[in-house]
Amino acid sequence: MVPKLIPVPLSSSSFIEFGSVLDRNLTKKISINQATTTRFHKMATVKAFPPDAEVILSIFSGINRGYPLEINMMERHPIGTQAFFPLSEEPWLVVVAPDSGDKPDEKRMQCFLAAGNQGVQY
C-alpha cells in the first residue's frame, strides 16, 4: 500500500537527495533585446549519458487531476537529466522516490509543494 503523502515546501535542502531546485527568484537575471526581455541565466545544466548523446528540449502540458491525487505510475530516466518548470505561476506538486533496483522505493516516496516560480531538475 502506498503511503499517504503530506506535501512539504520545496527547497534546495529538502530536495537535495533527488536533484536540484530551479528558482527564477534566485537566478541571475540579464536584460536583453533592448531591455524588452529578461533572461534567467544558467538555471540548469543538461547532462546526458553517454556524454555525446543528443540533448533535446520538449514542453509538456498536463491537466490538473484534482485531489486526492492517486499516484499509480512513476517514471525513471537513468540516461539523462530532466527539468520540470511550470508554465503558470500556480503552485504544483513534485512527487519523487529514490531508486530501489528496478523500481521506486515507495516507502521513501516524498511529495513537495513547489511555488509557481520553482522547477526541479533530476
Task: Enumerate the language-model features and the residues they cover.
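Short acidic-glycine-tyrosine-enriched beta hairpin
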Residues: 103-121
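Non-catalytic, conserved peripheral segments adjacent to functional cores
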Residues: 1-107
